[in-house]
Curated annotation (Swiss-Prot):
GO terms for cellular component: membrane; plasma membrane. Signal peptide: none annotated. It comes from Escherichia coli (strain K12). This is Gamma-aminobutyric acid permease. Pathway: Amino-acid degradation; 4-aminobutanoate degradation. Residues 118, 175-199, 268-286, 356-358, 424-428 are periplasmic. It comes from the Bacteria. One of its GO terms (molecular function) is gamma-aminobutyric acid transmembrane transporter activity. It catalyses: 4-aminobutanoate(in) + H(+)(in) = 4-aminobutanoate(out) + H(+)(out).
Amino acid sequence: MGQSSQPHELGGGLKSRHVTMLSIAGVIGASLFVGSSVAIAEAGPAVLLAYLFAGLLVVMIMRMLAEMAVATPDTGSFSTYADKAIGRWAGYTIGWLYWWFWVLVIPLEANIAAMILHSWVPGIPIWLFSLVITLALTGSNLLSVKNYGEFEFWLALCKVIAILAFIFLGAVAISGFYPYAEVSGISRLWDSGGFMPNGFGAVLSAMLITMFSFMGAEIVTIAAAESDTPEKHIVRATNSVIWRISIFYLCSIFVVVALIPWNMPGLKAVGSYRSVLELLNIPHAKLIMDCVILLSVTSCLNSALYTASRMLYSLSRRGDAPAVMGKINRSKTPYVAVLLSTGAAFLTVVVNYYAPAKVFKFLIDSSGAIALLVYLVIAVSQLRMRKILRAEGSEIRLRMWLYPWLTWLVIGFITFVLVVMLFRPAQQLEVISTGLLAIGIICTVPIMARWKKLVLWQKTPVHNTR
């Protein structure tokens, strides 16, 4: 691919409808459909509190991130802001951790999609489906950011329609007007051991499970930097995040726990949404949910490729990754970053097949606490960035509520959750693995500093990498 004459300027090909739909569906992760049954089995109907707490945390984090992103829109998003507010080492570390998170998402989501397709066409092996899906989406991302936006627009629209239809059917059933099944009311919320059958500890445990579902809400601040009016889109996405979480998560999960017993045998294996459809005697419930999950994981895979490549591009532009990763093609797409991110994802698949199981388990576990670590860095960055922006005389057009007290509360809450995870056997290895990976990245700072002759331990100005 030929290089652009302006090798460090990304295109602004995302249209308003692309960014709008991305902001609406960006909070709808595939794990809402795949993993919600695990959280429900853990906490019972009180899983609603788990989603509420996790949702409130995301609302706070998005508000903090938006304050910084509106002031200085940047493809590197929170990594760039950590660079300026905390220090080069912080932006460097969290940028690479975030890139690694999405690199791991690529093969995991591709495998889920491939398994669904394999169940439809058993003659084609799973690995071939996975390869074809990944290469097809990589090719789409290489062409232009407009391709990513257009593809994601339709995938996101399908997710939104599916969830709204599910909520509508559930509401009709709860109201007692559904003619094809004898279900009504919300007694399931308390008739199987009460609303909180396993105690508040189970609610906290379920919240840790649900946190992964929300990862991706921040992508809109990365994508908006490639639109014509990033500030407008970021403000709109931030102001609407409350109703998006309320509708897509709280309302849909309420329908689930109101209609089916939380301790129903086989709930984890069948899935919560499919269980509701089967209860309502919807024909081909499994096929319907397979289609919805396939669309969702494809959307997530598409976004993973986009996000990983943009973070790698931003790291390169700031001197925190080799300069070759900042090259773009004629359509102003960071093609080297896209290819290297896909290559790294394929490498993890090779490790899965040929390395000892413990090695691959460490790689997967190392991404477990990255979401919370990213949120913690965003909160600390916003706490310090407000003062920096004021000192520079920059206009702060969107403000975090009750600054700095609410920011400190969020920092304290995230720290508390990480400590709790450290002492819970189910999440202990994730925190330790993520911590070891972060320490390993930090240890490369002196090497990068010597190689690039940079002072990575100082705060530096934000350089827009659009």
